[in-house]
Amino acid sequence: MPRCPAGAMDEGPVDLRTRPKGTPGAALPLRKRPLRPASPEPATTRSPAGPLDALRSGCDVPVVPGPPHCVARPEALYYQGPLMPIYSTPTMAPHFPLLNLPTHPYSMICPMEHPLSADIAMATRVDEDGDTPLHIAVVQNNIAAVYRILSLFKLGSREVDVHNNLRQTPLHLAVITTLPDMVRLLVTAGASPMALDRHGQTAIHLACEHRSPSCLQALLDSATSGSVDLEVRNYEGLTALHVAVNTGCQEAVLLLLERGADIDAVDIKSGRSPLIHAVENNSLNMVQLLLLHGANVNAQMYSGSSALHSASGRGLLPLVRTLVRSGADSGLKNCHNDTPLMVARSRRVIDILRGKASRAASGSQPEPSPDQSATNSPESSSRLSSNGLQSSPSSSPSLSPPKDAPGFPATPQNFFLPTTSTPAFLPFPGVLRGPGRPVPPSPAPGSS
């Protein structure tokens, strides 16, 4: 009875009748197959006449001994079949034909992988997050490792803009971590400043979002001419200038304007200009900076509203005053036929839009009303004092009306009669006595 081969009991129940014959590990890939152990040399040396003597009967050609069997050779890593003599050059081949020898389907000597190819494969290998060694070296600010990996990328003709699972390139990570030297190195090596992340933002958007004017300067200086487009919108419809205005980074705004960014560019969703974004963020310094560089103060969004509409509706008094002084049109109508004066809710904003508060802010006194000028004249004050009336409410502080709040028009002064004195009639008929009704003329003496 044939014995069970060694190791068969460890492989589980199998049908020995249908099991193919083969060496252990034959089902594994070539690179994972175990190496063949070298067997010891036989005790008896082989005679010069080998197994080919039967093929060479009657041949006078001397026998060329081949290499011994079971010698460790490179092909042993890939081929598990029987070993045969190898003739590397034609001069070492025998002078007789080798008959009845099977031809191997592939070469027995496989070329070994070059160490440089292994380094390139290791440099471009990704982990479970999609990060390559270049991503990790950039985040760790390892300049030497980045130089080495970039040289391997160049030798292997690989792209520097490799995206991880978050659609971030090594350049994006360098900008996020605020590494201007790393940004300059990557852009010089061929990284594109226009590569988009998962939010549609370029490296320029990210530099403005993270308030990094140094990285923005490195991007704009290292990029080749024509490779940077400052009017690219992200998935929110914002340009890099919109992002810089929203984050309040004035240095980034100045850099973008110096490089030719459109100061009146509108976002795609609402049509707001950078000036309207600055007004809605209540950023007075940013509004003044944009107006100083020529922003259109009357630019309208898709709804027809301007920056003055936004400032008036929100009651932003300093911004309303700045926009009005810069030439904003207070009569401009939006799609609902509303002017900034109509959407304003604050009385002080209304006064600024009507032009009244501008004179009060300059230090000039408001013009007196006709009734107040008549009552404040010396002639009227003498007549009032002769009839027992108070010439001014300042003589009785307890009865004086409260003062007006700053910015509101002054209320006309009223004259009050003393509560203890008897009301005296004025010498001429029809004269007003304070806020009351006109006094009827007194009847003439002797009249019925």
Swiss-Prot record:
Biased composition (Polar residues): 361-376, 411-423
GO-annotated biological processes: antimicrobial humoral response; canonical NF-kappaB signal transduction; defense response to bacterium; defense response to protozoan; DNA damage response, signal transduction by p53 class mediator; extracellular matrix organization; follicular dendritic cell differentiation; germinal center formation
Pro residues bias spans: 437-448
The protein's name: B-cell lymphoma 3 protein homolog
Subunit record text: Component of a complex consisting of the NF-kappa-B p52-p52 homodimer and BCL3. Component of a complex consisting of the NF-kappa-B p50-p50 homodimer and BCL3. Interacts with N4BP2, COPS5 and PIR. Interacts with CYLD.
PTM comment text: Polyubiquitinated. Ubiquitination via 'Lys-63'-linked ubiquitin chains is required for nuclear accumulation. Deubiquitinated by CYLD, which acts on 'Lys-63'-linked ubiquitin chains. Deubiquitination by CYLD prevents nuclear accumulation.
Function, as annotated: Contributes to the regulation of transcriptional activation of NF-kappa-B target genes. In the cytoplasm, inhibits the nuclear translocation of the NF-kappa-B p50 subunit. In the nucleus, acts as a transcriptional activator that promotes transcription of NF-kappa-B target genes. Contributes to the regulation of cell proliferation.
